Amino acid sequence: MGGEVRGAFETLLRTLSLAPVVVQAPAMGVGENQRPTFLLPVRSSSHPLLNPDLDYSVYLSNPFFFVFFQVIILLVTVYAIGSEIKFRTGDEWLEAARMNMFVAVVGKLLPYTIIFCIMSVFANYIMFGVMHIPFACGFWPLNLTAILFVVATQALAVFLFSLFPAIAIVISVVSMVGSLGATLCGVTFPVDSMYAPVHYASYLFPVRHFVEINQNLLYGDYGFPYTWVNVSSLFAFMLLALVLLPHLKTAILSHKYENIR
C-alpha cells in the first residue's frame, strides 16, 4: 500500500516540476509535438504482483477481518472465564476439573476455540474462494495460521484475566489491548516507520505477528525461515498463560474478587 501512495506522490511532484519547462519550451525551440518525448523520455510502467488493479480490498479485507475478530475473541474469552467468578461458581468449576486449573481452562474454552476456528476458516473461504482475492500460498497454510492466531489470542486473554481476575476490570483492559493491537498491527501504517518504542511494543500483540505471517503467505510465500520468529511468538503467548494459571487458581479459591463490580 505504501508503494501506491509513494507512486501517486511522485506523479504529482513530477507534474509540478515540469510546469516551468512547459512554459519555456517554445523559447527553447521545442515544438508542441516534441514536448512529451522531451519532457518524459522514459515512462515508468508498474505491474503490482497479485493485485494488478490496485484494489484496496485485496490488501485490507483479510487483515481487517482478523483485527476486529481478535477483539471479539478477547472479550468472549475473558467473560467465559470471568463469569465463573462473577456468578460465584468457581469452586464447582474447579471441582469438576479435579482442582486442575489447566483442565478447567481448556474444558471451558475448547468449545469457543472450535467455534472461532470454524469462523476463521469460513472467513478465509469467503475471501479467497468466493471473493477471489488472490494469494500466493495454499489454502491450508492460511487456515493453520488463523487457528494458531485464535489460540494465541485466547491465551493472551487468559494471561490478562489472570493478572486482573475481576471481570469488571478486565473487560476494560482487553478492550484497550484489542484497540492497541488494531492500531499497531501494521495494516494501515507501516510499523517500521513508527517511533522505536512503539515499533517494539507492537510485537506484544498476537495480531501483529499474524499480520506479518499472513503478508508473507499472501504476497510471496517466501517460506518458514521468514516467519519462524512470528510463529514462535504466537506459541510464546500460550506459555505466558500457563505461567499464570496458578495465580488464577489462587484468585478463584480466595473469593476476594467476587464482590468487585
Regions found by a protein language model. Give the residues of each.
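Hydrophobic alpha-helical transmembrane segments of multi-pass membrane transport proteins
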Residues: L50-M127
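Membrane-spanning alpha-helical segments of multipass transporters and channels
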Residues: I114, F122-I126, P134-R261
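Short amphipathic alpha-helical interaction/hinge segments
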Residues: P20, Q24, I73, T89, ...
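Transport-system extracytoplasmic interface segments
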Residues: M1-V76
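Juxtamembrane loop-helix boundary motifs flanking transmembrane segments in multi-pass membrane proteins
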Residues: P36, S45, L49-D53, W93-V106, ...
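Generic macromolecular interface patches on structured domains
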Residues: T15, A19, P26, L75, ...
